Swiss-Prot record:
Family: Belongs to the peptidase M17 family.
MF terms in GO: manganese ion binding; metalloaminopeptidase activity
Enzyme class: hydrolase
GO cellular component labels: cytoplasm
Keyword Manganese tagged: yes
Reactions mediated catalytically: Release of an N-terminal amino acid, Xaa-|-Yaa-, in which Xaa is preferably Leu, but may be other amino acids including Pro although not Arg or Lys, and Yaa may be Pro. Amino acid amides and methyl esters are also readily hydrolyzed, but rates on arylamides are exceedingly low; Release of an N-terminal amino acid, preferentially leucine, but not glutamic or aspartic acids
Domain of life: Bacteria
Gene designation per UniProt: pepA
Residues annotated to bind Mn(2+) 1: D265, D342, E344
Organism in which the protein naturally occurs: Bacillus cereus (strain ATCC 10987 / NRS 248)
Xref: HAMAP family: Cytosol_peptidase_M17
Pfam families associated with the record: Peptidase_M17 (PF00883), Peptidase_M17_N (PF02789)
Active-site positions on this chain: K272, R346
Protein name in UniProt: Probable cytosol aminopeptidase
Cofactor dependence: Mn(2+)
Length: 494
């Protein structure tokens, strides 16, 4: 699909950058000759807009080998960022898709500035082409045919091999994010814990990773009482899924991802209201993020060791379901007083974190649609983060900045630890109250990470979008897939 050329050929469409300061760039001047001065007129009349994310279409009317030019407004160069580039290109690719373009090119060098080189632009362009044109996988009987972009050519004076490599990496990042989106969007009667495990196994086998899927009996032997408690009310068997990627000869410096895999959450006996239950098929967004990251890792083969652990079940009501006031024993040996069965994700993750440590994780990053509290605190565009290790958090933060997936650190104070340790009957309680809800959930998980360097990512607000946006439709976003993969790719770099 991707090609790199030094010069422009014949294409249905060509994407060109347009900065406010460069209305008379060398390319625009050259193209204006073919248009006999009319392009400059369009600029002067402001029919070609330089505003951020503005897309202006110009038909060549046979004056060049290109059918249509799509000028992408980027505003002023001084305020140009990768986030602006992603959004603008996302909108451009959506426009091309709506026009059913199958052969397009991008004048890569027109997007290059002192801040962004051609490799950065190539990576983002290939990534965003996939993200921006993603469509919901529906179960409708009347499905419309989709016209795909079949050929995409980067026109640049830069080294062809380096640009090809950047296009490949960007494409893989976009595709894996879309894989995660599709998982999150799947209905819960289709994506059970068993089906999620089957998906993970297929992924592991495709990329020659080791894997384990623990069944209920094995979990009982290992004492995974927290995950098993959440599963008590279900007819669907639980799964503890582990994918193991060995990128080094020695099994050292192992990065452990733990993704919450609650395939549907009714709240249990702490039952959600009707309006709060719809959409809870997405409560396995953390698991999807981890699997998406492992897809990228499997494809690109970084020289790192990575474990992905997914504790998976649904959380439903029945005569056998766990109840408020229950006291359960986690795999770590720590006992937990259940005050809220709708705080089940942290219970599943507690055993997931302990199991990841057992498998050899030296660093832990958990990802979960964990609390509504993080949405109240940070909204729908920023992931909440907590940590016991600033050095590890800084690496996660840098990866998130590279991928434009915003995260913000929340605190853990000793008084927060005292609140989750406050129980007359057990070592911990799973829900100290609504105050500081997101912080309480993260603090609880920190009790199981213990001294292992750990970062918690609460994607409850960022995992899904209520409306269409520049990088995709309403629904799952694939939040943190690219950040996790970038963390692994950059891990340990100075």
């Amino acid at each position: 699909m991707f090609h790199v050329q030094k010069e422009l050929g014949s294409h249905e469409a060509v994407i060109v950058a347009l900065f406010e300061e460069e209305k008379t760039s060398s390319f625009v001047k050259e193209l204006d000759k073919a248009f006999e001065g009319q392009l400059q007129v369009l600029l002067e009349e402001k029919e070609l807009s330089t505003k951020k994310k503005a897309i202006s279409k110009v038909h060549s009317l046979g004056k060049t080998n290109v059918k249509r030019y799509y000028f992408v407004g980027l505003g002023k160069k001084e305020s140009y960022t990768t986030e602006i580039l992603r959004a603008a290109l996302g909108k451009a690719f959506k426009t091309l898709q709506a026009a059913k373009v199958q052969d397009a090119a991008i004048l890569l060098d027109s997007f290059v500035t002192e801040k962004l080189d051609a490799i950065d632009v190539a990576h983002i362009a290939a990534e965003v082409q996939g993200l921006g044109t993603y469509e919901l996988q529906t179960y409708k009987s009347d499905k419309k045919d989709r016209v795909e972009l079949e050929k995409f050519t980067a026109i640049t004076a830069e080294d062809t091999q380096e640009i090809e490599a950047a296009l490949t990496v960007g494409y893989v990042h976009g595709r894996a994010t879309n894989s995660a989106r599709t998982l999150v969007n799947m209905p819960p009667n289709v994506l059970t814990a068993t089906k999620l495990a089957e998906y993970a196994v297929e992924l592991a086998e495709k990329y020659d990773m080791d894997y384990k899927v623990l069944e209920k009996e094995e979990m009982e032997e290992l004492g995974m009482g927290a995950l098993l408690a959440v599963n008590q009310g279900s007819v669907e068997p639980p799964k503890m899924i582990a994918l193991i990627y060995k990128g080094k000869e020695e099994w050292t410096d192992v990065i452990g991802f733990v993704g919450k895999g609650i395939t549907y959450d009714t709240g249990g006996y702490s039952l959600k209201p009707r309006e709060g239950m719809v959409g809870m098929k997405g409560d396995m967004g953390g698991a999807a993020a981890v699997l998406g990251a492992m897809e990228i890792i499997g494809e690109l083969r970084p020289e790192q060791n990575v474990i992905a652990v997914i504790p998976s079940t649904d959380n439903v009501v029945s005569g056998t379901a766990f109840k408020p006031d229950d006291v359960i024993t986690s795999m770590s040996g720590k006992t937990i007083e259940v005050l809220n069965t709708d705080a089940e994700g942290r219970l599943a993750l507690a055993d997931g974190i302990t199991y990841a440590k057992k498998l050899g994780a030296n660093y832990l990053i958990d990802v979960a649609t964990l609390t509504g509290g993080v949405i109240v605190a940070l909204g729908n565009h920023t992931t909440g983060a907590m940590t016991n290790n600033e050095e590890l958090f800084e690496q996660v933060l840098e990866a998130s900045m590279e991928t434009d997936e915003s995260i913000w650190q929340l605190p853990i104070f000793d008084r927060d630890k005292e609140r989750v340790r406050n129980s007359k009957f057990a070592d911990l309680n799973n829900s100290p109250g609504r105050e500081g809800h997101a912080v309480m959930a993260g603090t609880f998980l920190g009790e199981f990470a213990e001294d292992t360097p750990w970062v918690h990512l609460d994607i409850a607000g960022t995992s899904e979008s209520s409306g269409a946006h520049d990088l995709g439709p309403a629904g799952a976003t694939g939040a943190m897939v690219r950040t996790l993969a970038t963390l692994v790719e950059r891990f340990g770099e100075e």
